[in-house]
Swiss-Prot record:
<protein>
    <recommendedName>
        <fullName>UPF0301 protein Mflv_0850</fullName>
    </recommendedName>
</protein>
<dbReference type="GO" id="GO:0005829">
    <property type="term" value="C:cytosol"/>
</dbReference>
<dbReference type="Pfam" id="PF02622">
    <property type="entry name" value="DUF179"/>
</dbReference>
<dbReference type="InterPro" id="IPR003774">
    <property type="entry name" value="AlgH-like"/>
</dbReference>
<comment type="similarity">
    <text>Belongs to the UPF0301 (AlgH) family.</text>
</comment>
Amino acid sequence: MASPDDPEDYQDRAAPAAHRVRAGTMLLANTDLLEPTFRRSVIYVVEHNDGGTLGVVLNRASETAVYNVLPQWAKLAVKPKTMFIGGPVKRDAALCLGTLRVGSDPVGVPGLRHVQGRIVMVDLDADPDELAPILEGVRIFAGYSGWTIGQLEGEIERDDWIVLSALPTDVLVEPKVDLWARILRRQPMPLSLLATHPIDLSRN
């Protein structure tokens, strides 16, 4: 996990390609990964340690309103204010990510755990009214994506995933944005060319 001591960690900065998985990096499904659960998925890595890797899919919105599940968090939830499908593991469990307001410091704030930059894990048992002054918004995920130790590394060696750095704006982007393509477009050549890969392969 990144150290929160550097105030620059809480600013938006350009996100270059990453060379290793760590908390705060993203896994983009490569074009050959066609399994429906993860095709064109963007996974934000929340934890990566000796026990394995945990992340949430950023671009899989559900039709379930946050208000119907966790009404106390509906006000802080960003549009479209629906639950997102974080992955195939424990769909009955909820996990929340939030983006800090610029200049806010999460250190010592009950209910927040710093991940990277301005992104924090939010304890859903906390009082949202107490956290609202320092959060731009939150997104709540049903379930998560997980890998045992060494499993993700094997998938990366197989070229299933592209490991990239994240910007705070990636985490709360609206579903109408093609997040997978947007992230690739900001990468250097030749990686940015993958952004032109068609969504519907039958039209290629």
